[in-house]
Amino acid sequence: MSQSKYRQL
């Protein structure tokens, strides 16, 4: 779940 947030960075 959290990984999806970092993938946009």
Swiss-Prot record:
Its cofactor is NAD(+). GO terms for cellular component: cytoplasm. It is found in: Cytoplasm. One of its GO terms (molecular function) is urocanate hydratase activity. Its EC number is 4.2.1.49. It comes from the Bacteria. Binds 1 NAD(+) per subunit. It catalyses: 4-imidazolone-5-propanoate = trans-urocanate + H2O. Keywords: Cytoplasm, Histidine metabolism, Lyase, NAD. Pathway: Amino-acid degradation; L-histidine degradation into L-glutamate; N-formimidoyl-L-glutamate from L-histidine: step 2/3. Belongs to the urocanase family. Catalyzes the conversion of urocanate to 4-imidazolone-5-propionate. This is Urocanate hydratase. The lineage of its organism: Bacteria, Pseudomonadati, Pseudomonadota, Gammaproteobacteria, Enterobacterales.
